[in-house]
């Protein structure tokens, strides 16, 4: 093991022997993260040194370098959410505790690790923390030093925020938004109790970072359109895939300076100076002539206090959407599923039109999660 002085000596020797022409340059490729898409074939997103540097300058500005920071991450390093814990911890000289898959699959082991972690900054998908809330021991007593929960990668629901406020005292809840193609995230907002109550239906993802501009392409009469990101964290494109790069990426302008742009495929709108995201445009389905946002159904199902988690998927027949199926985790023992299903549908009918009521409700003990900690929609579709 090297001590600090030995490491400094090695670094100074190495630095002196390398010509400046070999230093990493702003536009040099720094890392590639593969992301799946509608085609099912992963695409390698090319992030430059400049992309990451600009992200870090902005993101780490929310923290005090003098504080003893311990980032806690759960996603594998192949998932872009890990960028929010790995690189900031190095940049700030902070610590990083990584919960590996083996521990995630065993609550006893995972909770032991969480308790020992001394984590101050929690970073995860909303689905991952919902999984943790299955155990009543998941609270401030387990992690007394945690002061901030940061979420990205999925829609954050008000019910999840309320659980955190209830179980973790004064800890901040931060909602963010951004695709892999723009170096993880480009927005930030603290969801206070007041904000959570005000925007219960759809929480804001926050104000847009400096060096970035967001506009909405082809907005409808309500001002909702596809989110387009222009700025200094937008990637070079997809690795060895010029066709899709040219389709999704382009050039924009910020303060007279040319910057990369990216078409996200996400539906959004602005309100009160903040960006709101309504999910993937391709998560919308058309059923009997009605266009339906599936996450809207989930959001309304969660207004039922007996439902802890919900995820709705379409059921297809001959390539067309024939009905909707909602998977739910129920908070109580179920004796008569037919009666409970009927009650859930009756409650939902008070909130949404008839055409948005799922034909079938499936009860699960827990939601299947993919390797990135998100609800595995493909697995749910297989269960339909």
Q: What feature does the model see in each segment?
A:
Residues 43-72, 80-120:
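Conserved AMP-binding/adenylation subdomain of ANL enzymes
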Residues 30, 46, 70-72, 78, ...:
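Short, well-ordered beta-strand segments
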Residues 1-22, 52, 172-175, 190-384:
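AMP-dependent adenylate-forming
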Residues 17-34, 65-71, 77:
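Conserved pre-ATP/AMP-binding loop-to-beta segment of ANL
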Residues 32-45:
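Conserved adenylation A10 loop of the ANL superfamily
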Residues 91-94, 119-123, 133-200, 204:
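Gly/Ser/Thr-rich phosphate-binding loop
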Residues 38, 93, 153, 231, ...:
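Conserved G/P- and acidic residue-centered "switch" motifs that form tight phosphate/ATP-binding loops
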Residues 1, 94-117, 123-131, 155-156, ...:
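ATP-dependent adenylate-forming carboxylate-activation enzymes
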């Amino acid at each position: 093991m090297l001590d600090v002085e030995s490491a400094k000596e090695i670094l100074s020797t190495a630095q002196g022997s390398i010509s400046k022409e070999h230093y990493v340059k702003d536009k040099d490729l720094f890392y590639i993260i593969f992301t799946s898409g509608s085609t099912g074939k992963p695409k390698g997103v090319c992030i430059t040194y400049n992309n990451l540097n600009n992200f870090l300058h902005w993101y780490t500005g929310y923290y005090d370098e003098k504080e003893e920071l311990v980032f806690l991450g759960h996603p594998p390093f192949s998932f872009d959410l890990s960028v929010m814990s790995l690189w900031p911890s190095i940049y700030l000289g902070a610590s990083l505790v990584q919960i590996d898959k083996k521990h995630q699959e065993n609550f006893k082991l995972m909770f032991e690790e969480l308790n020992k972690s001394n984590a101050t900054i929690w970073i995860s998908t909303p689905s991952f923390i919902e999984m943790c809330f299955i155990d009543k021991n998941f609270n401030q007593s387990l992690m007394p030093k945690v002061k901030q929960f940061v979420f990205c990668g999925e829609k954050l629901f008000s019910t999840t925020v309320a659980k955190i406020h209830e179980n973790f005292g004064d800890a901040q809840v931060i909602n963010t938004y951004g695709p892999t193609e723009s170096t993880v995230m480009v927005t930030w907002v603290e969801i206070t109790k007041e904000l959570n109550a005000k925007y219960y239906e759809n929480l804001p993802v926050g104000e847009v970072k400096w060096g970035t501009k967001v506009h909405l392409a082809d907005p409808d009469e309500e001002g909702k359109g596809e989110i387009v990101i222009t700025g200094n964290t937008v990637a070079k494109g997809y690795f060895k895939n010029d066709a899709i790069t040219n389709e999704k990426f382009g050039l924009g302008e910020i303060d007279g300076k040319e910057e990369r742009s990216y078409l996200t495929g996400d539906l959004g709108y602005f309100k009160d100076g903040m960006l709101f995201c309504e999910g993937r445009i391709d998560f919308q389905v058309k059923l009997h002539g009605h266009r339906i946002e599936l996450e809207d159904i989930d959001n309304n199902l969660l207004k039922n206090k007996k439902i802890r988690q919900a995820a709705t998927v379409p059921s297809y027949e001959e390539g067309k959407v024939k009905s909707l199926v909602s998977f739910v985790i129920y908070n109580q023992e179920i004796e008569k599923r037919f009666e409970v299903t009927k009650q859930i549908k009756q409650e939902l009918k008070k909130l949404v039109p008839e055409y948005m009521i799922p034909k079938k409700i499936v009860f699960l003990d827990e939601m299947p999660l993919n390797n990135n900690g998100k609800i595995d929609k493909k697995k749910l579709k297989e269960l339909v």
